[in-house]
Design a protein with these regions (language model features):
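Bacterial N-terminal signal peptides that target proteins for export
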Residues: 1-7
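Conserved SAM-binding strand-loop segment of SAM-dependent methyltransferases
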Residues: 84-90
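Beta-strand-loop-alpha-helix segment that lines the small-molecule cofactor/substrate pocket
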Residues: 102, 108-109, 113-139
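Acidic-histidine catalytic/liganding microenvironments
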Residues: 54, 97-98
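Conserved acidic residues
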Residues: 60, 85, 99-101
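N-terminal Rossmann-like dinucleotide-binding module
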Residues: 10-13, 19-80
């Protein structure tokens, strides 16, 4: 029994009786997720490369307040995928993209909140790289 058949059977047995399970055809196992990178230092680019290496993601947008970092990341990303991501100097314009599935936030601890909250306002899926350490001042 295939995955699709199993899901349809499960929906029918749980009381959600219909001739066709709604939403099952919309979820493709070959889906490619469009990612927007926020924070173009080495950590952000390396996390993004991991996403791209799965074959299920591509970078469509890049934002960093430091233009030189964004341009460097754009060149590096273009070398590992077919199409170059668009560079943005306005975070809100990047979030306005309808095709943006995931916002990958890899910025310093001090800046994470503003980028996270703004992505929430735009109802985006978020992957945030959180540092797991405390500075000497926080101890």
């Amino acid at each position: 029994m295939g995955y699709k058949s199993f899901c349809c059977l499960l929906l029918l047995l749980t009381g959600n009786v219909s001739l066709r399970a709604q939403g099952i055809d919309d979820i493709s196992p070959m889906a490619i997720y469009n990612i927007g990178l926020v924070g173009c230092d080495s950590i952000g680019v390396n996390v993004l490369k991991t996403f791209i290496s799965t074959g299920e993601a591509r970078c469509v947008a890049v934002f960093d307040e430091k233009t030189t970092l964004a341009e460097s990341a754009e060149r590096e990303i273009t070398s590992i995928q077919d199409k170059a991501p668009l560079l943005y100097n306005d975070y809100c314009k990047m979030l306005d993209r309808r095709d943006l599935d995931i916002v990958l936030i890899a910025v310093s601890k001090e800046e994470q909140d503003k980028f996270f909250l703004k992505a929430c306002e735009y109802d985006k899926n978020i992957y945030i790289e959180i540092s797991q350490c405390l500075s000497p001042e926080e101890i």
